[in-house]
């Protein structure tokens, strides 16, 4: 089958005509770094056009389209989709970001740019495909900052582990229960002092390595502290973060992560959808009218899932410290020996996700009268 001579079915042509009747011409674009593959249906010549444009010429194509109507530009979710969506919207057109898995249903040939663009084009005028909201520039940079913080934290752990391995090779076994980098540096200093007393020839090389370790750790810790200070200041000045921090168990950094990963709250139809996006929806299977609710699924946004789990653990710790009379719903669940503790934590995390969506959607702080599971114990 030749992509250049591709013919659309009558049903596909009807869907395109419906879009055009609404004042939008569907255009499918396969995004890339330097060249974009553009595909659309020419209503005058009755043919599918599928051609390649450079980055500059693509945006010229958006500014001066070959038809009078505005365009509905569809493309797959990728690294460039948010920027392109903002540019398309600024030029007066509409965009449609689609999940990559949804486009696979329209790909019937080998993998080429033209075939991908054709599949994206067909997905653009198909109304049943779910769309993804584009993130604004502030949200993107905030997510990038959180990614840098996580990367620096991993580097700090990696630096400590490398030094532990070096100490082990020199006969120093570190305590497994002491995981901080400061402990590793202290153990290295003790080894250095021992080598100095023994007049060991290895003293100079260990000294240089220890100084490099100290410098690297100080540098990483300073960068992490700088980023966290910015995030704390951001949380204090952002209304959504303030409302999120009013939820028991959610701190400033967790609120910023929730706010950043959530993005546009209107892209989730309900709080249940946001909880499922976070990965705290139970697996459901059913047949013949019998439905079984299983364990928590392993899908979902891993960053959001980790933060909500830690917030749920924090809320559980709050309950142990504050609820001396066992008056809260969490205390009732903990009192049931048949309920596993992690199951309680997952249920709290699920409720945290749903309440977080609600407070951001309604732009109001947490009201513990409306949620018994997360409410703090009252003073008697």
Regions found by a protein language model. Give the residues of each.
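Short, basic/hydrophobic alpha-helical segments
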Residues: 55-72
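Gly/Thr-rich phosphate-binding beta-strand-loop-beta motif of the actin/hexokinase/Hsp70
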Residues: 20-41, 120, 152
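Extended, structured, electrostatic nucleic-acid-contact surfaces
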Residues: 17-21, 225-248, 258-261
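Phosphate-backbone recognition surface of nucleic-acid-processing proteins
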Residues: 243-246, 252-337, 341
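Intrinsically disordered, low-complexity and often Lys/Arg-enriched segments
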Residues: 1-24, 49-51, 56, 372-380
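Short alpha-helix plus adjacent loop in nuclease-associated cores
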Residues: 96-132, 137-140, 144, 182, ...
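Glycine-rich, often acidic, oxyanion-interacting loops/wings at catalytic, nucleic-acid
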Residues: 150-241
């Amino acid at each position: 089958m030749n992509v250049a001579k591709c013919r659309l079915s009558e049903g596909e042509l009807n869907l395109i005509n419906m879009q055009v009747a609404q004042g939008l011409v569907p255009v499918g674009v396969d995004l890339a770094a330097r060249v974009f593959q553009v595909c659309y249906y020419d209503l005058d010549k009755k043919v599918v056009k599928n051609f390649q444009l450079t980055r500059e010429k693509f945006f010229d194509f958006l500014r001066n389209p070959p038809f009078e109507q505005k365009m509905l530009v569809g493309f797959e979710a990728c690294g460039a989709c948010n920027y392109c969506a903002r540019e398309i919207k600024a030029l007066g057109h509409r965009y449609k970001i689609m999940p990559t898995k949804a486009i696979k249903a329209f790909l019937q040939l080998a993998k080429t740019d033209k075939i991908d663009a054709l599949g994206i084009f067909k997905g653009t005028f198909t109304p049943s495909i779910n769309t993804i909201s584009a993130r604004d520039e502030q949200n993107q940079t905030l997510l990038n900052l959180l990614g840098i913080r996580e990367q620096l934290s991993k580097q700090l752990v990696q630096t400590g582990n490398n030094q532990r391995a070096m100490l082990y090779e020199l006969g120093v076994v570190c305590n497994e229960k002491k995981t901080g980098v400061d402990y590793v540096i202290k153990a290295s200093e003790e080894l250095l002092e021992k080598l100095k007393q023994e007049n060991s020839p290895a003293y100079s090389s260990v000294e240089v390595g220890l100084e490099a370790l100290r410098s690297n750790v100080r540098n990483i810790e300073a960068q992490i502290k700088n980023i966290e200070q910015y995030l704390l200041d951001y949380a204090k000045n952002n209304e959504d973060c303030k409302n999120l921090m009013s939820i028991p168990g959610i701190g400033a950094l967790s609120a910023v992560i929730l706010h950043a990963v959530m993005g546009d709250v209107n892209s989730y139809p309900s709080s249940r959808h946001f909880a499922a996006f976070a990965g705290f929806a139970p697996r459901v299977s059913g047949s013949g009218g019998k439905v079984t609710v299983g364990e928590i699924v392993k899908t979902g946004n891993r960053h959001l899932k980790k933060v909500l789990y830690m917030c749920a653990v924090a809320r559980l710790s709050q309950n142990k410290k504050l609820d001396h009379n066992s008056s809260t719903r969490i205390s009732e669940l903990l009192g049931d020996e048949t309920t596993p503790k992690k199951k309680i934590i997952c249920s709290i995390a699920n409720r945290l996700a749903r309440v977080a969506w609600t407070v951001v959607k309604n732009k109001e702080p947490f009201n513990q009268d409306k949620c018994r599971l997360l409410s703090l114990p009252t003073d008697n």
